Structures are given as structure tokens and as C-alpha cells.
Amino acid sequence: MAAKIRQNDEVIVLTGKDKGKRGKVTKVLPNGKVFVEGINIITKHEKPVPALGKAGGLVKKEAAIDASNVAIFNPKTNKADRVGFRFEDGKKVRFFKSNNEII
């Protein structure tokens, strides 16, 4: 099955502490989670690893967010939108459901 949200798509967060924020998808996991640039930032406590020359401390990093909690952003309407699939010239393409424009 084709993915409705793919890497480098601009998305908007629908629920949670970052609701309403926009960002670019950096990674899509096969279990239905996505990493969005600058969204869902967590603080990890990391131990130092002297063998690798890595210092320990508090590290801020992006955590995965469920794909159902984000929607693709339509730049024409400036709103979140749904994605549909159709065949054009023998190829499967994604399109915005609000205005039928190909993504």
C-alpha cells in the first residue's frame, strides 16, 4: 500500500503539545510513525562514551509522532488536507482531496 505521508512532505500537527505547528517530514517508519523537523522535541539523558570521545549530558532530539496525528499541508488553501490516490498516464499519483491538485 502506498504511503499517504512521505519524506519531505510539509505537514501540520493535529493533536498534542505541538498542535497547529508545521514542519517537514524527515523520516517515515514502517510502523506508521513519522519524524517531523522541529516537532515533538524530547530531552534524553545520555551517558558519556570516552571510547568514542562522546560527552554525556542532556540532549534534545526529535521523537516520532504517529502519522494519524499529522495531516499534509496544502499550500494553495493554507490548511491541512486529505490525500487521495488516482492513476494518471498509467502511474499512481497522490492528490489533495480539497482541490484535486497533484502533490
UniProtKB/Swiss-Prot annotation:
KW Transcription (keyword) present: no
One Gene Ontology cellular component annotation held by this UniProt entry: ribosome
Record-stated family: Belongs to the universal ribosomal protein uL24 family.
Name this polypeptide is given: Large ribosomal subunit protein uL24
Gene3D superfamilies the record matches: 2.30.30.30
Subunit relationships: Part of the 50S ribosomal subunit.
NCBIfam families per UniProt: rplX_bact
Alphabetized CDD domains for the sequence: KOW_RPL26 (cd06089)
InterPro entries, sorted: KOW (IPR005824), Rib_uL2_dom2 (IPR014722), Ribosomal_uL24 (IPR003256), Ribosomal_uL24_CS (IPR005825), Ribosomal_uL24_KOW (IPR041988), Translation_prot_SH3-like_sf (IPR008991)
UniProtKB keywords: Ribonucleoprotein, Ribosomal protein, RNA-binding, rRNA-binding
Entry annotated with the keyword Plastid: no
Gene for this chain: rplX
PROSITE patterns noted in UniProt: RIBOSOMAL_L24 (PS01108)
Biological process terms in GO annotation: translation
Function summary: One of two assembly initiator proteins, it binds directly to the 5'-end of the 23S rRNA, where it nucleates assembly of the 50S subunit.
